[in-house]
């Protein structure tokens, strides 16, 4: 089988694609893959490092206000459509799968027009503009949250709940009991992990600094991941405050988030779709702080999917400070029954066979 995959821009589009590709390769080592992305997206480094063939097309996103840039976007779409058609014709895929990002539009549009089975995978609880555009053309629409069904109401017969392949990958990962020691952490107390995504969050870092004295007194320990860009500033600030941290570990980033999650008791984080899939796959309780800087405020909608099921609580960024952060953590960590219930609710939301479900759809489409 020959599988062409397209998706890019952010890790939330790329890692689910790689998880699915890895799974399909395990099931059938003869499967051939081609990944189509952009030169500027993260996929241009991540995908080749993962060992997959990679080709690029030139595309840019739509500016949501009236702008002459959208004429350039339209031009890029037209030219990239013909480039995508050439790539598809040359590779001769049995199926084409899009995991989101603007690069998917010309690739899946071309494949659909050529009569090749196509699947889009929507990770969020609000559909992205590219997937909305492609919904009419594709064979199947795979989703991770029930809330997104309304965005595909016209195409309900195409919609299939699959979950996110990243969840299956995490659920099958083996816990490494030596991991914490390898990054300088002793599991003497329960661990609260705070992180603001791959680039970190200025407001979350500021709230952490405000809460330093309180965190030092707690019966749980705090691991704060600042993001590489903020690390020196936070470290220097802690030094200038003459703080000797006994109950807190500050790290710029974590290379193996899977192992960190598996050794954590509570997570405080943004509510990107892939992060939520990881939390529910592992059954972790969480405090979600949606980024207000994303398209259509979709992270708040993502968070509500867990909050409504009592698998997480939420603090809006405008309400976030040291006091509110500590208070919310204490409400969960100081109530064992509450923490356990949230963990069970989180686990119940997890779909841990997403790649298997997608494989079934693929085989139903590839005759």
Residue locations for each model-derived region?
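Donor-nucleotide binding loops and adjacent catalytic segments primarily
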Residues: 46, 50, 175-178, 183-267, ...
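Active-site-proximal region of nucleotide-activated glycan assembly enzymes
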Residues: 32, 42, 53, 112-176, ...
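C-terminal alpha-helical cap of glycosyltransferases
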Residues: 351-367
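Acidic donor-binding loop of glycosyltransferase active sites
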Residues: 93-95, 251-254, 262-277, 284
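A short, well-ordered alpha-helix in the C-terminal region of glycosyltransferases
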Residues: 338-352
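Conserved nucleotide-sugar phosphate-binding/catalytic loop shared by glycosyltransferases and other
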Residues: 3-8, 27-76, 81, 162, ...
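Structural loop-to-beta junction motif characteristic of Rossmann-like glycosyltransferase folds
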Residues: 52, 116-117, 265-266, 283-291, ...
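Glycosyltransferases and closely related glycan-assembly transferases
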Residues: 83-96, 104-119, 132-140
């Amino acid at each position: 089988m020959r599988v062409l995959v397209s998706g890019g821009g952010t890790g939330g589009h790329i890692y689910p694609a790689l998880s699915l590709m890895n799974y399909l390769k395990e099931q059938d080592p003869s499967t051939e893959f081609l990944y189509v992305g952009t030169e500027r997206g993260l996929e241009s480094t991540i995908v080749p490092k993962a060992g997959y063939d990679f080709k690029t097309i030139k595309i840019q996103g739509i500016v949501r206000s009236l702008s002459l840039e959208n004429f350039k976007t339209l031009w890029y779409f037209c030219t990239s459509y013909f480039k995508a058609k050439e790539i598809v014709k040359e590779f001769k895929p049995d199926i084409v799968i899009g995991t989101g990002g603007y690069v998917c539009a010309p690739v899946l549009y071309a494949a659909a027009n050529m009569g090749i089975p196509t699947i889009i995978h929507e990770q969020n609880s609000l559909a992205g503009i590219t997937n909305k555009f492609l919904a009419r053309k594709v064979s199947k629409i795979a989703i991770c949250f029930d809330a997104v069904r309304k965005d595909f109401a016209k195409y309900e017969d195409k919609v299939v709940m699959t979950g996110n392949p990243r969840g299956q990958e995490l659920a099958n990962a083996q816990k490494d009991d030596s991991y914490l020691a390898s990054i300088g952490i002793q599991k003497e107390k329960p661990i609260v992990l705070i992180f603001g995504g791959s680039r970190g969050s200025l407001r979350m870092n500021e709230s952490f600094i405000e809460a330093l004295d309180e965190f030092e007194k707690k019966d749980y320990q705090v691991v704060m991941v600042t993001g590489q860009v903020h690390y020196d500033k936070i470290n220097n600030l802690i030094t200038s405050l003459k703080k000797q941290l006994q109950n807190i570990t500050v790290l710029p980033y974590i290379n193996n988030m899977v192992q960190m999650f598996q050794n954590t008791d509570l997570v405080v984080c943004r509510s990107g779709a892939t992060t939520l899939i990881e939390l529910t796959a592992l059954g972790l309780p969480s405090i979600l702080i949606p980024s207000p800087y994303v398209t259509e405020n979709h992270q708040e909608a993502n968070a509500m999917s867990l909050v409504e099921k009592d698998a997480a609580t939420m603090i809006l960024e405008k309400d976030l400070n040291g006091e509110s952060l500590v208070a919310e953590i204490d409400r969960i960590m100081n109530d064992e029954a509450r923490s356990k219930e949230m963990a069970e609710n989180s686990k119940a939301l997890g779909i841990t066979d997403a790649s298997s479900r997608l494989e079934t759809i693929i085989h139903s489409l590839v005759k």
